[in-house]
Amino acid sequence: MEKVLILGLGNNNGGKSSLLYFASKPDKYIVRVSDIAPKSNFKFIDEFKDMNVEFFFSDQDPKENIKWADVVIKNPAIPSKLPQLSLAHHISNDIAYLTTSEYVKNTHIITVTGTKGKSSTASAITHALKHLNKDVIICGNIGISAFTVLTELENRARQGIPMPDYIVIEMSSWQINDTYIALNAKMPKIKLAIFTSIYSDHLNSYKSKEEYLLDKVKLFNTNCELILIEKKIKKYFAQHRPQLVKRTTTFPKDSNPYISNKIELQCAYRALKLLKFKDSDIHNALFTYKGIPHRCEQVDVIDDIMFINDSAATIPEAASYSCKNISPLSYHIIMGGSDKKLTTLGIRFAARKASTITLLDGNYTQNKLIPYLEKHNYNYTGPFRSMQEAFDSAYTLAKEVKANTNKMQVVILSPGATSFELFTNEFDRGDKFKACVHNINNEANQ
């Protein structure tokens, strides 16, 4: 039997899905779990008490467990340069297992990466393909493990159910690099590979923007039948992948009917055109797309104040991009948080055009954002240590401006920073914002 080590359970159920996949096959795998965090961090562990799994929590040095394993399933958040990983016999991940499975040999794989817009683009394409009567499954960085999809495909095979027409995989730079390592410096066969945008990100994990982007471009090689990239990336892409220029298309083109819309609609339209769908069918499919949680998600409108949850805006440029989409409405932004070693350059539009600014606390807020705001004489309230305090401040300010202008106001959570000092992750941050909105609505209806 193969000895499998799940290295890192993570915050978004990826590790749980990996554990479930291997632990449910006791005739094939012997399973261990190693995580630096204590057991109390993982509420779901009791679900595995009747399975033959060894857990090593608060495991500060996983060296012996790594040496024990035939294969290490590495959580993407664990650095690939972790010294102990040099002792591994083989390192893999969920995407490598899925894309090399016999069950996907007749399924078209679509991959989506990019600093900004990858989740919403993957979601829009998946939505459209379903509307076009295609059997499609989405997974990856969007919060659905490829092991969950692989389990479904195995169940389909047992029941004689056809495999999906398409699998859409959203891939972070870490997932791309992990898959590249798992497949021995290769990538799986891809029908359409998409690169949505380039900005600095994860500089708390990468030495430079260039190192970060080099992981991104590992996704693109002769394994890709079709390639779609944002036109701003064209020069960079040609420098790093000159052999792929002939199979590469850019978006948006001047003829793109979604050129004035959000990036996901621009990209999804061009992607579906490359996949040979008709214009009228594409328009009908995208017309019904309503977006995904935490990404410019309209939560509610109460007394002419709109509430938007954009918690997934974890870099400054993403916050400014979202604010451009709601301007010229008067908006009251909740921003700030933890530092990914990014500059404040990208936050300029969001801060300059905001009617009011409310700050969430964090080392990015304290060390970079507040000095930037004060340098440019932008007023702000906070920083606050809880979402409720920040929300109450922004909401009060929005009501005051509305009373004076009698115009619709927008309260938007678009932090432009990560969340880990005050929240579990960006989804927890967004959920707490939505809970604040729902509390107002409940009070109004009493």
What do the PLM-derived regions correspond to, one by one?
Residues 98-142:
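Walker A (P-loop) phosphate-binding motif
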Residues 22, 72, 112, 141, ...:
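Residue-level signal for inorganic ion chemistry
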Residues 10, 37-39, 142, 232-233, ...:
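Residues in the short beta-alpha loop(s) of Rossmann-like NAD(P)-binding domains
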Residues 32, 36-39, 45-47, 345-409:
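C-terminal helical cap/extension that packs against the catalytic core
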Residues 3, 21, 257-354:
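Nucleotide phosphate-binding/pyrophosphate-handling subdomain across enzymes
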Residues 415-446:
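Glycine/aspartate-rich loop-and-adjacent alpha/beta segment that forms the canonical ThDP
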Residues 1-25, 29-111, 287, 295-297, ...:
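Short, basic phosphate-binding NTP loop
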Residues 159-255, 421-426:
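Flexible active-site lid/hinge loop adjacent to a nucleotide/diphosphate
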